[in-house]
Amino acid sequence: MEIKYFLVLLVGFLLVLPSIVNPYRKGVTITNQQPKINIYQLDVNNPHNPNNNPHNPHNPNNNPHHPHHLHHHHHHHHHHHHHHHHHHHHHHHHHHPHHPHHHPHHHHHPHHHHHHHHHHHHHHHHHHHHHHHHHHHHHHHHHHHHHHHHHHHHPHHHPHPHPHPHPHPHLHPNPHPHPHPHPHPHPHPHHHPNPNPHPHPHPHPHHHHHHQEASECLSYQGNRNRLFIKRDY
C-alpha cells in the first residue's frame, strides 16, 4: 500500500514537475501579458496603445528596432503620461521652438497628433499672433513713424526732399533757415513766384536767374529749387 501511495505521489509530482521546472509554460506567460493589458488594452481606443495604432513606431510589431519588453512599455506609458503633464505645463513657454525635434515620434499617433497639433497650432497661433501683433505693431509704429514723418514735413516741405538740404550750401531759396528750419520757410517759396523771397546774402545770382529763367521757373513750379540749384553751377 505504501508503494502505491508513493507511486501516486511520484506520478503526480512528475505531472506537476514540468510547470515547476519550466515556469514559462503556464502561469508566467499569463503574468507576462498582464501588464500589457493593464497599461494598454483596458482602453481599446487609446491611441497610445501601440497595438491600436499600426503607424505607431512604438509598436514593437512595426518597429524592428524597438525593444519588446515590459519595462519599455511601462516606460513608454509613463513617458506619455509625463509628456502630457509636461505638455500642459511646459509647452506654452518652451516646447514650441523645439517642436520638430522635441518628441519626433509623437506626431505618428493620429489621436495624439491631432491633440498635439491642435494644441501646438493653438499655441503657435497664439504665440504667432502675439508675436505678429507685436511685430506688426512695432513695424506699424516704425512705418507710421516714417510715414508720419514724411507726411508731417512734406506738406510744409518742398515736394522733393533734396532741394531743402541743397539751399543751405548754395545759399539759395532760404538764406535764414535756422530759427524755423521746417514748417515756416518753405511755405513762402510756394506763395512767391520767386523761389528766393529773401535775397539778402546773394542778390546777384538770384537776379540773374530771375531775369533769364523766369518762364522756366514758373513752368517747373515744384522743381524750381532744383532747377535753380542746377543752374547755379
Curated annotation (Swiss-Prot):
Keywords: Secreted, Signal. GO terms for cellular component: extracellular region. Its main location: secreted. Residues 1-23 form the signal peptide. This is Uncharacterized histidine-rich protein DDB_G0274557. Residues 45-64 have a biased composition (Low complexity). Residues 65-211 have a biased composition (Basic residues). It is found in: Secreted. The keyword Secreted applies. It comes from the Eukaryota. It comes from Dictyostelium discoideum. Residues 42-217 are annotated as: Disordered.
